[in-house]
Amino acid sequence: DYKTMPLDDAFKIKKEDYFTKNGGIIFPNPNAPTGELMSVEDIDEIISHNPDSVVVIDEAYIDFGGKTVLPLLKKYDNLLVIHTFSKFRSLAGSRLGVALGNEELISHLYDVKNSFNSYPIDALAQVIGEASIQDSDVIKEHAKKIVATRERTKKSLKEMGFTMTDSYSNFIFVHHDDFDAEYIFKELRKKHIIVRYFNAPRINQYLRVTIGNDEEMDAFLDAVKEIIQAS
C-alpha cells in the first residue's frame, strides 16, 4: 500500500507531511509537472525525521538549475538518489539510469532487481552512457542554453499576463487568469504546437510547456500572442 501526499496551495511539497511514521518515502525533486524545487536543507530535515525508512529522491531534472542532495549520501545510510540519462543527457531511448546510495542499500536493490528482471544493460547502451559521461562538459553547456531559454520564455509569458511556478526543470507550468488553459491548448494544436494539458483537479487551468531551442520557443510565443490578441 502507498499514500500520496498533496502539495500545498503553491504546488510545493510540505516537509512536515513526511515527519510521521512510514514505510518509505519517494518524491521527485524538482517536481513534475510543476518544476518546483525543494531545498537540500528541507530534504535533510525530512531524512533526519525518518532514520528507519528509506528516502528516495528522484533527481531526473536536477541538472537544469537545481542543487543536488548527493552530498547528503555521506551523512545518511537510508538515502537513495536516482538519476536518469533521459532528460539532461537526452538519451531516453537508451533506458539508462543510476541509483546512488549506501553500499548495503544498493546490494538490496540488486537482490530485488534480480528476482524479477535479470536482464543487464545492453552493450550499446553502456557505450552510449559512457560516452555521454565523458562528454559532460558539452552537455552542461547545452543545459545552460535550455535554462537561459526557459528564463527568457518565462519573462515573455509574464509580459502577456501569465503566471507560473518557479520551475527548475526543462519545462514550465503556466496559467492565465483570463484564458482557459484547454482553449489555449487546442488553439496551439491547430498551429501544430503541442503543449501538455492536464484535465485533472487543481491543475486543469495550467499548461506544461517543454523548453525547446530559441527558434521553437519564439514560434510558441508568437502563437500564444496571436491567440490572446484574437480573443
Spans of features found by a protein language model:
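Short beta->alpha connector loops at strand-helix junctions that form conserved
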Residues: 3-8, 83, 198-199
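PLP-dependent enzyme catalytic core of the Aspartate aminotransferase-like
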Residues: 41, 187-191, 196, 200-231
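Conserved PLP-binding catalytic core of the aspartate aminotransferase-like
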Residues: 147, 159-191, 207
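Short beta-strand-to-loop capping motifs
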Residues: 101, 174-178, 211-213
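Active-site phosphate-binding strand-loop segment of PLP-dependent enzymes
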Residues: 7-63
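Short acidic/glycine-enriched loop/turn segments that link adjacent beta-strands
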Residues: 12, 93, 168, 202-205
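PLP-dependent aminotransferase class I/II
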Residues: 78-158, 162-165
